[in-house]
Structure formats: C-alpha cells, structure tokens
Swiss-Prot record:
The active site is at H75, D120. It is an enzyme of class 3 (hydrolase). Expressed by the venom gland. Gene3D superfamilies: Phospholipase A2 domain. GO terms for molecular function: calcium ion binding; calcium-dependent phospholipase A2 activity; phospholipid binding; toxin activity. This is Basic phospholipase A2. CDD domains: PLA2c (cd00125). Snake venom phospholipase A2 (PLA2) that inhibits neuromuscular transmission by blocking acetylcholine release from the nerve termini. PLA2 catalyzes the calcium-dependent hydrolysis of the 2-acyl groups in 3-sn-phosphoglycerides.
Length: 146
C-alpha cells in the first residue's frame, strides 16, 4: 500500500472515531422540533425555543417570564408525569399529522407514546398561540429565574 493511501485511511478512521463520540439527539427532541414547526407554520425555528426564559430548554426553575415560558413549564411537567408512569419521553417517537390547523396525534395506541405525543402537540400549539419576546431569549437564569 502506498503511504498516501495509508494517510487517507488513517484520516478516515480518526474522523469516524470522532463522530462516534458525539452523542446523538434523542429522537423525540428531533420529532418535537418538527411538531413545533408544524404548529407555527414555519414562522419560527424550533431552535428559538431551546434557550428561552426559565423553562424552555434543559432544566427549568423559578417563575416563568411570560406565557410562552409557561408553555415550556407545562411541557416539562407533562414529561414529568409521563416519567412517573414509567415512560421515557425524550426517547419515544409517535405518529402525528400536520394539518392546516396544526399538529395532531394520529393512531398512537401505546400509552407512553400517546402521553408524549399529547405533551408535545399541546406545547407546540401553546407556543404558536403566544407571543415570542426576543428579550427573553438566552437570559441570565441565575438572576431572572428565582
């Protein structure tokens, strides 16, 4: 084998090892982003909700900064209830329909999948109903979420 071929092979192996160490997003969070996009008809990226207020994104504490943040608090609580039932909300996927009036759960028969679908659809519709305040994106949660 030529030295150049060995270098290419080594580069491929190293890049594959690096890619293997990147944790994948839980499937449900990817699906939830599609449900959000369906509910707001593509007017706002689901990423805009990933770091909004005190509850949108990882974790959550304190008093929600507005109604949109309250949607996230309710969604967190909904996932908490699903976990109490033995479900793993961030790992479950479900079948939903994106109609002209927003997302709906479709033919979801398993209890846990149905609970998670209901949580996600309710949150996405709540996001679409409430105003997005740019001032509440990426806030200092240590100061504002007490």
């Amino acid at each position: 084998m030529y030295p150049a071929h060995l270098l290419v092979l080594l580069a491929v192996c190293v890049s594959l090892l690096g890619a293997a160490s990147i944790p994948p997003l839980p499937l449900n969070l990817v699906q939830f982003s599609y449900v959000i996009t369906c509910a707001n008809h593509g007017r706002r990226s689901s990423l805009d909700y990933a770091d909004y207020g005190c509850y949108c994104g990882a974790g959550g504490s304190g008093t929600p900064v507005d109604e949109l943040d309250r949607c996230c608090q309710i969604h967190d609580d909904c996932y908490g209830e699903a976990e109490k039932q033995g479900c793993y909300p961030k790992m479950l996927i479900y079948d939903y329909y994106c109609g002209s009036d927003g997302p709906y759960c479709r033919n979801v028969k398993k209890k846990c999948n149905r609970m998670v679908c209901d949580c996600d659809v309710a949150a996405a519709k709540c996001f679409a109903r409430n105003a997005y305040n740019n001032a509440n994106y990426n806030i200092d949660t240590n100061k504002r979420c007490k």
